[in-house]
Amino acid sequence: MNKKITDSIIYVGVNDHQIDLFEGQYVVKNGMAYNSYVIFDDDIAVMDTVDINFTNEWLANIEEALNGRLPKYLIVQHMEPDHSANIENFMKKYPQTIIVGNDKTFKFMSQFFRNDSFLNTLVVKNGDTLSLGKHTLTFVFAPMIHWPEVMFTYDSFDKVLFSADAFGKFGANDVKEDWGDEARRYYIGIVGKYGVQVKNILNAASTLEIEKILPLHGPVLSAPLTHYLEKYTVWATYGIEKEGVLIVYTSIYGNTKSAAELLKNELLKLGTPSVEIYDLARSDMAEVVGKAFEYGRIALASPTYNMELFPYMDQFIHKLVERNFQNKTIGIISNGTWAPVSGKLIKDKLSLLKNITFLEPVVNILSSVSAENKDEIKWLARELAKGYSISTSDVDKHNTNSLFNIGYGLYVITTNDGKKDNGLIVNTVTQLTNTPNRVGVTINKLNYSHYIVEKTKKMNVNILSTDAPFSIFEIFGFQSGRNVDKFKDIGVHRSDNGLVYLSNYINSFMSLDIVSSIDLG
């Protein structure tokens, strides 16, 4: 499948729908893409090969793209077999080609192919350049992203960064899906251990003028690239993407599951903006590991098994430790009958990591959840939900200071249809009377939010501040809440009426009950 990327760069990669496990461990229900590119100039360069199972398709793609011309260079950015397996087959067809790589590239090449016939080579160093004519390629070494020989290639003519495995994702390119979730799962699984190295290469890339990023997996990323770079910065620095609490549990006879479900319900009562719960025995481990990096607050619940951690929890924690998991707040629920040590084992293993805060004490269950345990779980929920809820104990519900922030500007009204949160940009909010306090909000009755407000008789009004970015207007003004989750990448809290309000870009918010409505036509 050939595709034009720029006037002089053609995509010649392949999609793999035969694969079920990437690297023998990651479930890829939508397959994988193995990307390869051809740069056309006075001299032609082919960027990387593809998996061995797609030799014929890939070579046919290249032949079609070349249209009778011959390549001068094969640039090898990464020697992992899903990208290098066809070097030998390529050289048999185009023996005049010069293979470009670094010292480690050729060391690994000799180990994989045991072939001394690759004599037509060009060894490059970090920062070296290669002219193809109009195109000048600069090689930027990116060791341990995620192998030691990896290098990126910057094309200053088309302002393109060939990024090897960085900025890749799971999934074939002929499947339409959100980039973020599968890119996160890919990053955490494949590159997550090497945050320092990723941060260093991001700093180096920030000095370049880049309009497109061409990874070895996943789609080509085009300007504006801010969203993708911001995500990688958060992942590389082990930052928090999503406010809320992640609950991860294992259970043998259902008692630990009951404790985890009780914690979930208590967190929801407290207005926690997002609560996700996963049973490790019935979940994709890589997905849950990715979720653990997404949240800043996590609860782990596990029984003891043969005086050790239950195997799924042990494996989960091993994967966190292996990936330098850090900067988290952890609550622990331990269960056991005759040797209840799971809580201690969880804490001992995670104590090896940086900036892990444990909520003490551990909730210790003996076989089944007792009345005392229920109180302890409620306490744990309050600790995990701190700062998330606005309740009557925190504020005066009749405080009218928000009214002074009403002016000519824009507002986001937030609602909930009983299944999910929704939000909408409006431009007219007016204080109608002072005694009693009455506020008028104008909503287009064709919008889904109008239907929700009429049904639920409540809403929150978020008064936007002057620093609200244009992306806020795009999210809440340019798409329908019927079909998308508008709060997917937005920080929120939840007020005691059960509705969310924005945690950023607002001066204040008001929780309103609907006492009457007027149809203006």
Predicted feature residues:
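Conserved beta-strand hairpin/beta-sheet module of binuclear metal-dependent hydrolase folds
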Residues: 2-62, 152-155, 159-162, 256
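Metallo-beta-lactamase
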Residues: 3-7, 44, 51, 101-223
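Active-site metal-binding motif and surrounding structural segment of the metallo-beta-lactamase
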Residues: 42, 53-100
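Short acidic active-site motifs
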Residues: 86, 284-288
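FMN-binding flavodoxin-like domain, especially the glycine-rich phosphate-binding loop
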Residues: 175-213, 218-220, 262-276, 288-394
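Short N-terminal or domain-adjacent regulatory/targeting segments
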Residues: 212-241, 315
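Active-site-proximal mixed secondary-structure blocks
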Residues: 393-521
